[in-house]
């Protein structure tokens, strides 16, 4: 009797196992199913980008005059602010006013399109991140979802903050120094539109990427590659590197503008120390 009961229980367990495996196989997506999901994600992202681009294209003349070309005039808000508080430390010339020239027939039209796409991509960045998250979330474990969800949000915020710092601090000082630099009095600077846009876009996006440093440090610590003790031990070396980086970004020579760029970089380093998790200490506590 007991033998028959055990046989029935084994058959039921086997049946349940087979049913579970069948459900998992049914719920599992094939390679082509994943491609289909990715295709629709890319399609939705392209539609969102196109809609936003229409808006940025229409508003681009206003955006160009009020924001993109604003650092070419001495009336730019950061210049006025420095003149009001700088005193004798910061000396900005009062006649700074650069005229951007165009040397190609189609350059203005192509710049209109390219800047509209770039600005639309920056505005749509959170939506792109959301689509990426939706695509990879089903393949993640619960613990990974718990860690990566705030990372995606924090990375987006830090990217926008970095772009804002790049626009308000890094680009104006770098641009002003390079424009006012004269190898010879007989040479007149004439800034080409494409050259201006390339530098404008590059410096702002670079600062957006640099502001991902705490997120990168945190992710490296999760994999055991980076430790809090390492960042603390080499803090003095990092300060020197950050000062050199700030001097390269803002080659104007005065300490005030140097500090305006160095301080955000140093704050990012301190944030990296705060967010990094030292796995070794955690394992030692668990062993105790």
PLM feature spans:
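Membrane topogenic/interface segments and analogous intrinsically disordered interaction regions
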Residues: 2-288
């Amino acid at each position: 009797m007991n033998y028959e009961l055990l046989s029935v229980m084994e058959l039921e367990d086997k049946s349940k196992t087979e049913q579970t495996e069948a459900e998992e196989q049914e719920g599992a997506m094939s390679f082509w199913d994943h491609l289909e999901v990715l295709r629709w994600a890319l399609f939705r992202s392209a539609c969102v980008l196109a809609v936003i681009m229409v808006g940025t294209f229409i508003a681009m003349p206003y955006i160009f005059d009020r924001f993109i070309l604003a650092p070419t005039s001495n009336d730019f808000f950061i210049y006025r602010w420095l003149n009001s508080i700088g005193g004798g430390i910061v000396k900005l010339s009062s006649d700074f006013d650069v005229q951007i020239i165009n040397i190609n027939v189609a350059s203005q039209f192509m710049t209109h399109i390219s800047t509209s796409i770039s600005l639309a991509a920056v505005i749509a960045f959170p939506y792109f991140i959301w689509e990426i998250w939706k695509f990879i979330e089903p393949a993640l474990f619960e613990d990974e979802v718990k860690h990566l969800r705030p990372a995606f949000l924090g990375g987006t915020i830090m990217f926008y903050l970095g772009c804002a710092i790049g626009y308000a601090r890094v680009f104006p000082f770098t641009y002003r120094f390079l424009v006012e630099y004269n190898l010879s009095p007989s040479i007149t600077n004439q800034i080409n539109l494409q050259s201006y846009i390339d530098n404008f876009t590059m410096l702002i996006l670079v600062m957006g990427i640099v502001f991902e440093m705490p997120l990168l440090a945190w992710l490296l610590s999760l994999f055991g590659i980076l430790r809090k003790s390492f960042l603390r031990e080499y803090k003095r070396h990092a300060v020197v590197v950050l000062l050199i980086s700030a001097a390269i970004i803002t080659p104007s020579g005065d300490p005030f503008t140097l500090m305006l760029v160095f301080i955000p970089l140093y704050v990012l380093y301190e944030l990296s120390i705060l967010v990094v998790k030292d796995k070794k200490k955690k394992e030692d506590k668990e062993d105790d």
